């Protein structure tokens, strides 16, 4: 009966989402304008609102509300504004109508960050070309699995590369387990992070090994993204902090993937990485399970850089006795990738952690920093760099 009720709920949600999509398509059809339009080194935004008094564009490259672009209205009620193209990158923006923030109905490219929805704008060129659709795309599955660790059915996204054939047992794939940050969920890396496009392009170019990427929900009390309307659950985890309580990855997810997909079933074929909260989780998961993972990526970790954001200085030795005094116990990774944005106040803590690892003779340590703060434009580049290092 419980299973039937869950299926009924899922069908109802699909129906409501389908209806919303039809309404959005109808709205965009009625709008009859092109927005955004990237042309001749400029970007033009348009929005139909004959009765509006004030319309503007709030964009990520302008600091959102700090510097909005005011739009002007023509005789047909179409508001517009043109602005010089920002540097190549994947950006987000919203339309603000009489103080109300909303989506641009002419742009079907929509991203969600927690409970906030934004339109996406890709300015091509340089590394941003990795974020464009590839001519050899892979696939993303939304997979429900049972977590015995948390006694709940949960959802994860699973990326498989172009050419993947579940029935071909002769090809085994390495797996990257990729974790989101605080406020995110299993959808974050595939939308905001452009994981699928990055992997598609790098694999097609021969810069990354064909691999699977598993993107779970790193919030132990959530069944799935809260957009599905499924309530959270009170749980008791094996570990105490928000950073190291994600024990379900090794207990539930790795066994599920290795039972249901043709993957490499040894530590050389496994990697774990994450951003911010997910970076802290990746650190605990990897160093607690050195026999399971040979590669770890820690992007802008609030755990390791905690002293800069009001927390106590991070002491890895406290969590993993012997990490600095007896490093041979943990010095077994092929790649320990550490990265942070240059304007992120976590960078000093990350740099300090990197130096301690080097001083203690840890092998495979790679450090990279990019212009940017605690934001996706940094983490997308981290992911791109990391997947080119692993499974060699």
List each model region and its residues.
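Bacterial N-terminal signal peptides that target proteins for export
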Residues: 1-8
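Bacterial N-terminal signal peptides
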Residues: 8-18
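Non-catalytic cap/lid and distal C-terminal segments of serine-dependent acyl enzymes
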Residues: 22-24, 35-68, 72-392
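Short, solvent-exposed loop/edge segments of extracellular or virion-exposed proteins
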Residues: 27-30
